[in-house]
């Protein structure tokens, strides 16, 4: 069942009612949309069954201020654990929000959930694989959080203020604070308007202040590394971050940054696109690449991510792959860039 919002919503309600425990997941290196959409979805679950057990599993810990806000709202629902080692004893319904498959939550690409766990998906990315039996995929939406809003509204569930705020965080994060091109831009504005009508303009600006203010020094030290490692070409630019870079910059191994290297450099010069390569914190042979278009619809980056085994949006995409060192990782990306676009680094 796909892309029929009323049918999907009703079937999801039925599945939750018949489940013992709901398992949600944050994808690797969770961004604001991953966090906001999953926390916002708790509003839906609590309206269906306020007593059902619910866990949110994340291999990577969110940034400190976000993590504390989640703990304050949800108690112990968020558990920092690798999904492949988590004990799915009572968990019989897994809901993937903002990613298409369980492999996006762990570094083990062969990991699968136990067979008795049913799955459902709420996503705004283009699928490279067959989606689960129950799914709502809407690629015109710029964020998964906006889909969570739609599902709550379809069910006529009133959004609690705290959950509504996490939904707005997800929307703002994936839209670049409403700066990215969005086919449903007016709808995004209407969701914000709804929040302001219910809770006041000042509370909306408090969300902005929370997301933009009081960044720790380590965040700026990471940005300095990305800028120091910047390489600019006529058609594109790229940067990188290794674990040694982090250590030399005085950034702890456990620090969870919010800066995306590609987003940081996306407006440089006459670049058509940019990318960043980062080393995994736990697996030194695993690297992640993030692509960002600098020209909107006039230059799409998703094909490069797909070529490297990933996916995403036309204008923002990513992948992860193995390499012996950062130079090899960058060269693999540059080779892909050349094969698909004719550019050489």
Regions found by a protein language model. Name each.
Residues 122-193:
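Short alpha-helices
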Residues 74-134:
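Active-site cofactor/cluster-binding pocket
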Residues 31-33, 98, 123, 174:
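Acidic active-site catalytic centers that drive phospho-/nucleotidyl reactions
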Residues 1-12, 110-119, 140-144:
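An acidic intrinsically disordered interaction segment
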Residues 3-28, 34-76, 85-93, 168, ...:
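Hydrophobic helix-and-loop "lid/oligomerization" segment in the mid-to-C-terminal part
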Residues 83-85, 108-111, 135-137, 157-158, ...:
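A generic local secondary-structure boundary/capping motif
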């Amino acid at each position: 069942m796909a892309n029929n919002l009323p049918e999907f919503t009703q079937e999801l309600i039925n599945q939750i009612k018949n489940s013992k425990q709901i398992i949600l997941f944050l994808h690797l290196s969770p961004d604001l949309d991953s966090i906001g959409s999953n926390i916002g979805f708790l509003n839906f679950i609590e309206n269906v069954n306020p007593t059902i057990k619910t866990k949110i599993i994340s291999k990577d810990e969110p940034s400190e201020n976000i993590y504390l806000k989640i703990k304050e709202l949800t108690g112990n629902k968020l558990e920092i654990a690798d999904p492949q080692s988590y004990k799915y004893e009572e968990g019989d319904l897994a809901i993937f929000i903002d990613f298409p498959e369980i492999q996006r939550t762990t570094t083990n690409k062969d990991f699968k959930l136990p067979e008795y766990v049913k799955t459902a998906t709420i996503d705004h990315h283009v699928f490279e694989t067959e989606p689960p039996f129950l799914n709502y995929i809407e690629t015109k939406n710029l964020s998964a959080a906006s889909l969570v809003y739609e599902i709550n509204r379809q069910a006529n569930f009133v959004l609690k203020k705290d959950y509504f705020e996490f939904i707005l965080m997800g929307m703002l994060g994936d839209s670049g604070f409403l700066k990215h091109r969005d086919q449903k831009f007016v709808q995004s504005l209407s969701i914000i308007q709804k929040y302001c009508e219910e809770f006041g303009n000042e509370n909306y600006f408090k969300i902005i202040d929370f997301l933009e203010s009081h960044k720790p020094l380590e965040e700026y030290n990471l940005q300095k590394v990305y800028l120091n490692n910047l390489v600019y070409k006529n058609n594109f630019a790229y940067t990188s971050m290794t674990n040694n870079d982090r250590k030399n910059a005085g950034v702890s191994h456990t620090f969870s940054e919010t800066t995306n290297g590609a987003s940081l450099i996306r407006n440089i010069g006459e670049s058509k696109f940019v990318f960043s390569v980062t080393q995994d914190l736990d697996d030194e042979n695993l690297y992640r690449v993030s692509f960002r278009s600098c020209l909107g619809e006039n230059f799409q980056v998703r094909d490069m991510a797909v070529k490297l085994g990933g996916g995403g949006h036309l204008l923002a995409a990513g992948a992860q792959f193995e390499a012996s060192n950062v130079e090899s990782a960058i060269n693999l990306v540059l080779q892909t860039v050349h094969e698909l676009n004719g550019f050489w680094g």
